[in-house]
Amino acid sequence: MRLYEDILIYLYTEYEMNITNKGVQYLAECIAEVYKDRIWSVHMTYLYEAIASRHDTTWKNVERLARQEVKKVSNNKLGEFILRQAIIIKQNKKKERNEK
């Protein structure tokens, strides 16, 4: 579970840095697909609300767009994408520790 917590932190960080919202939505939906439990859907709703408020729309609309993005890729690509993001997070944390 820790890996996905790291990815969620990465999501919020990327969103705050104003990286493409489509990428954030996509990664959020990847996590939501992997963990369909209630806790994750609450986190995803908060993320969708944050994106929606910035674009003057509803969180449901953001969720719908995110789901459409996910449908465009196969499950294998979905897993590869999450794995690549996890590796990036791990490398960044290692760099941070080495710099201290």
Q: Would you name each region that the model predicts?
A:
Residues 3-15, 19-25, 29-31, 36-100:
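Basic, alpha-helical nucleic-acid-binding regions used in initiation and control of genome expression
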